[in-house]
Each structure stands twice: as structure tokens, then as C-alpha cells.
Amino acid sequence: MEQSLMEKLTILADSAKYDVACTSSGASRAAKAGSMGSCYAPGCCHAFTADGRCVSLLKVLMTNCCAFDCSYCVNRRSNDAPRATFSPWELAELTIEFYRRNYIEGLFLSSAVLVSPDYTTERMLKTLRLLRNEYHFGGYIHAKAIPGTSPELLEQLGFLADRLSVNVELPSESSLKLLAPDKGRHSIFRPMKQIAVEGAANREELTLYRKAPRFAPAGQSTQMIVGASPETDHHILKLTEGMYQKYSLKRVFYSAYIPVAEDTRLPALDTKPPLLREHRLYQADWLLRFYQFKADEILDADHPNFNPYLEPKCNWAVQHYGLFPVDVNRASFEMLLRVPGIGPKSARRIWHARKQASLGLDELKRMGVVLKRAQYFITCRGFAGAHPGRGSAGRERITSALIDPTVFSGGVEQLSLFSPPAVDKLVAQGVPTHAAQKLVREEAVQCLARAL
């Protein structure tokens, strides 16, 4: 029986929920006369823009009928699930109707592999050509490039979309071979390299010809599944660092693995998604991009996984406590960035303000420094650094100031990094959740104090 448009939308929007796209668009194309939509300062997928607005997009698959059989994917060939496929005309018209009703401001288009990567990409191209050329849609479009797509089709896709992304999926080639045998390292990184090279060439061309067509003006991103394979956090972070450097990625997204199938190669169906691990990866990713950290400084062979109780930056400060305290009136900008409680904005404010006058605690507080954390790592005018005291009491005071409160306030599910979760174990023994969180926090503080 032929499916209605609403039935297709229900199936294909649900199938797209595992794709991550929570980011601002990064494009700055203004609206033109006779066109619909604008890319000026917006974001996508319920993201908050710099001016505080929350914008949305239609996130949907072209089809969930897949020729590949990736064991971790809900759309894999062997999965017994409802299937649907949009025609290019249906999807283009649906996007425009949603836009006219002010439901969305853009489109996030991905797809399972229907017949072959090239055949699927050709259908995506037809959809985007209809939107751009027939409907004159000027809004944000994020297109997922299919691994294995020919360079010619990928180039055409880049001139129609604002952002492209090729999902890495898994952190190592061995995991790809085990869990996604239809995909290979070359089929993923070749299009990544092409997007980076063509993007750089296009930017050069735009300096000479302002009206030259723009190739993926918002750059490229990728997504990695965390928890489906045995790689360490250090391995994942090194891969992330390499991709940022080699392929000029705008973002790397991390997705905590949600079990969707019973398979001996994958975690059991009752395994909770490693949400805390995903959160730590985003924090470390931020350090790579904005705090001038290297992956090997955050984690190493001796400490290959994140500390569940401390944010990566605080964990680094604890491990290198001998470098502190630093004088904020003399320290380098790079060292200011490494002080817990000081971020890029407050570091820049300190850097400029101290040229005019020596800074004290009052000035630092007005600049946004979180003194609860920073006080143990800095000195300034009239302040010789907080003295937490000697022995275990002093160490516990520092640890209590640094410990990540979200680990305990987020509930039992946030602790899914542990095996078994400490809070979960106490709750199973009859201890109330709030009391269990308090006990685990106290134990964590004592353990971290001993590490100091």
C-alpha cells in the first residue's frame, strides 16, 4: 500500500534522530530579493545563536532503506523496521511548506544508502536543486555526504549546501571492519580531504571574484559514536585533534551509543548510554579548540580515560599542581587559559586590563573569573593565593572546589561511565538517591584529595 506523506515523514524523521546537528549554521548569507529564507546569523536544530535566538530545522532522512548492514545502526539492512523513501519533489515541497508555516529555518538532510552511494547522492542533489533553483530557498542546508560518493557528485553537493559532513562513525579502522564492514577508512577520509581542499580553493577564489559560487561556506563537521567500540578516550581525542588539524573541521560531534540491536559485538541492550563520557569529550574538545591544549596534555597512555569526577581542565591542573599559583599580572596568556575558573573571555580581559593597572580580586571578579576555583591557583595584587590548609583537610578543600557538580546533580543515568555505577549500586541496596549521591561525592572528594 502506498504511504502518505505524513507516514513517510513520521518514519524518516524518527530514523534521523541519531544524527547530531546541534550547532549554529556558521554561514552569513543575507536574504535576496525574490528568494525565501536567510542564513544571516542563524543556527540550526534548536541551537542558540550569538544574539540569543533559538532556531530550528527539519532533520530528516531521504530514505531509511539501506544497502549497508552496520550493526550499530537502526537503519541497517537486516533490521526489521518500517521503511520509507521520499522523492526529491516530495522532500523539497515539504521543506518549503514547513518554512512558509514558520516551523523551520533550514534543512538537515541525511540518508541511508539506497542502491549505492552515488545513486543516493544524486537523489539528494535533485532535492537541493529544487530547493535552491525552483523554490529559490536561501535558508541554511546541512547535507550529510555518503561515504563512497564520487568526487564529482560531492563537489556538486558542496555548491548547493551550506555545510557538509561525513560521519567517521567509529574511532578506529578495526572497529569499522567489525561493526560496519561495508564502510572503510578510505571511503570516509577521502571525501573529508576533498571538502577541505575544495573549501580552501574556493576561499582563495572568493578573494579574487566576490560573486564566485560558494562551496560549503559553513565548512564541514563529523560525528563519532562513543561506547559501541573499545577505544579509549585518549584514542578518540587524538583522532579528533588530527581531524581538526588535517581537514579543517568546524566541529566534531560525539554521540553516546544507544543500544538498538542484540549483537554479541555490541554492548547489551540494557546498557545505559555513556552520557558522562560524551560530556567529558565535549569539554576536552573545547580545550583543543579554544584553550590551546594538546590531546596528549589532557590524556596520555598512563591516564587513557577521563576522570569521572573532574572536568578535564581541572584534572590537568590537579596533575600539574606544581606549576601553580601563577601571578595573573605577569602570567602568559597561555598559562592564564589553564587556570581553573578562567576562560578565554576573562583571560583576554585580564590580558588587556593589566596593561593599565595591577589587578586585584575585585577586578578579577568583575571580569568573570570564577574565584571559587581560581583562588587556589592564582596570586594577584593584595592576594597571595588561598591557603587551603595542610594535610588531607587542605587537599579535600581544593578537591571540593573543583569537583564537577553535574556528576551528582544529573542523577544515576549520568554516571553510566562507571561499571557498575556507584550511585546505582547504593540505590539498589535501598539507599535514597539523594543520600547515595552525597556518599559518592564524599568518597570521590577523599579519593581525589589523596591523588593531589
Question: Where do the model's predicted regions map?
Answer:
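Conserved C-terminal portion of the radical SAM core fold
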Residues: 172, 187-264, 273-299, 370
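Conserved Radical SAM active-site core
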Residues: 1-68, 72-222, 226-230, 261, ...
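Short Lys/Arg-enriched helix C-cap and helix-to-coil transition segments
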Residues: 362-366, 375
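Residue-level signature of tetratricopeptide-repeat
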Residues: 353-354
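Long, highly charged, low-complexity intrinsically disordered interaction regions
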Residues: 265-337, 373-422, 426, 451
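Flexible, acidic/Gly-rich N-terminal and inter-domain linker regions that tether
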Residues: 1-65, 370, 378, 386-409, ...
